[in-house]
Amino acid sequence: MKEIALLLDKSGSMIGLQKTTVKAVNNFICEQKLIHPKKRLSLIQFNEKRSWTYEHQKLKDIPTFENKDYQPSGLTAIYDTLGDVIKKYENNNTEVTIALLTDGYENASRKFTAKKIRKKIKQLEKHKKWKFIYLGADSSTFLDAEILGISKQNTAQIEASEEGIPIAFSLMQKMISNI
């Protein structure tokens, strides 16, 4: 079974993009339902904490993501989010694609370091055929992804705007289809 784990930044800097992000997530899920109806999806929202909106759900069973489900606030704990998600999945025999979308940079992780995450990513890509996608709006997006061991071909710099977020999810869709 293949699964997509969508890690969605819900830090305070995303406040002005709430409606656009919700719509883009719904469009992404609808497209995935058409392309990969048997896949499962987990949607993990993160700031300095993580919340699992959908967990290991079949795409066909996922309800509409609503504005009330996405309330941005707080800081951005990218390493802790990746670490927690990897820890949750790594003992399953599931082929996972982790797709992370952030408008900022790491500023709140307490449990995991970039070095620990990089080591895990390399192990999972080599031994379990996991894939990692990193979409970021920060000017250091490619460097941030490289530090984590995520390849340039699976990394993109996006624009955190009403126009940029839908484009980012469309790009994510293509990246997932190509791996």
Short names for language-model regions:
Residues 1-179:
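Acidic, low-complexity intrinsically disordered regions
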